[in-house]
């Protein structure tokens, strides 16, 4: 059946990711970071599958731990001193927790961008910004699709080189280096040619010209309007909560901020609902899909 949220209007998809990415980077409250990471994990697992999610986590979790370890080595602020390092600088609880928070934020943002690349395709991006910033939208759409396209082409080139006995993983060190350089040269040439061909193709079709019309398969339906209203409500509610201090949290000089007040709990729940919106939509769609045959 596929992901139900991906079939919504591109404006809904883009607004959702703009909100979750912005709040994931701005809100350093521990509860907000945990909620953002949870939502990103669930949605990435839904889009990519468990194996792909495990592969992403094998990269993200070491980054989280590295941030928690590196930050105390350079940041010695905080009033809760645990021990003194051989250099004489204190190791504080606040610096460790801030490193964990920064690592969690980084992991959540990376996972949200993984979901972004799966949902916001190049045609959606061009549809949203093609008339406003045609040149920049074309460059950004090409950039977004470059990495997965580059990986697929690299695998094709590696298999072709393997079939003719020039695999970069066999032979002496000098042979492996030469073959790796050859593959790299092939990929650079392919990337440049692909970019030029894409630009020439778009130019020949009149892309970016004033008054140019374009066919679009996207239509704003009632569900998209409801989704936009919901996302707008969540975004404004969280903005008001942040400005009112309901989501404030300080790591230095000591840990303090809003935690279990009813005023703050309402913001946590709204943020949780925002981050889980794609998952909830997909579960609801799956339930309707399962129930519909029984009613026939």
Spell out what each predicted region is:
Residues 2-45, 159-296:
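Transmembrane alpha-helix interface motif
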Residues 9, 49, 92, 121, ...:
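General structural signal for secondary-structure boundaries
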Residues 30, 49-50, 133-136:
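Membrane-helix interface segments
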Residues 32-34, 51-52, 143-145:
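Short, charged/polar low-complexity linear motifs in solvent-exposed/disordered segments
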Residues 34-46, 62-70, 119-122, 206:
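Short, charged N-terminal helix-start/capping segments
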Residues 46-55:
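Membrane-interface helix-boundary motifs at transmembrane edges
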Residues 56-174, 287-296:
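Juxtamembrane/interface alpha-helical elements of multi-pass membrane proteins
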């Amino acid at each position: 059946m596929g992901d139900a949220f991906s079939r919504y209007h591109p404006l809904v998809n883009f607004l959702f990711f703009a909100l979750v990415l912005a709040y994931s980077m701005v809100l350093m409250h521990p509860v907000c970071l945990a909620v953002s990471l949870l939502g990103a994990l669930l949605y990435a697992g839904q889009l990519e599958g468990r194996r792909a999610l495990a592969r992403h986590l094998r990269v993200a979790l070491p980054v989280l731990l590295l941030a928690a370890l590196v930050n105390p080595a350079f940041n010695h602020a905080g009033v809760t001193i645990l021990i003194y390092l051989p250099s004489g600088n204190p190791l504080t609880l606040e610096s460790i927790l801030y490193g964990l928070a920064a690592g969690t934020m980084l992991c959540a943002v990376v996972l949200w961008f993984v979901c972004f690349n799966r949902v916001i395709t190049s045609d959606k991006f061009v549809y949203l910004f093609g008339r406003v910033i045609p040149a920049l939208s074309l460059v950004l759409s090409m950039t977004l699709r470059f990495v997965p396209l580059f990986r697929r082409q690299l695998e094709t080139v590696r298999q072709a080189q393997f079939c003719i006995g020039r695999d970069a993983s066999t032979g002496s060190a000098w042979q492996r280096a030469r073959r790796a350089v050859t593959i790299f040269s092939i990929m650079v040439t392919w990337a440049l040619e692909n970019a030029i061909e894409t630009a020439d193709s778009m130019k020949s079709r009149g892309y970016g010209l004033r008054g140019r019309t374009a066919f679009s398969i996207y239509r704003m339906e009632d569900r998209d309007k409801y989704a936009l209203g919901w996302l707008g409500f969540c975004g404004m509610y969280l903005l008001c909560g942040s400005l009112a201090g309901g989501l404030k949290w300080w790591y230095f000089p000591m840990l303090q901020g809003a935690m279990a007040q009813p005023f703050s709990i309402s913001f946590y729940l709204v943020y949780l609902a925002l981050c889980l919106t794609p998952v909830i939509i997909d579960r609801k769609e799956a339930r309707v899909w399962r129930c519909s045959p029984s009613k026939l």
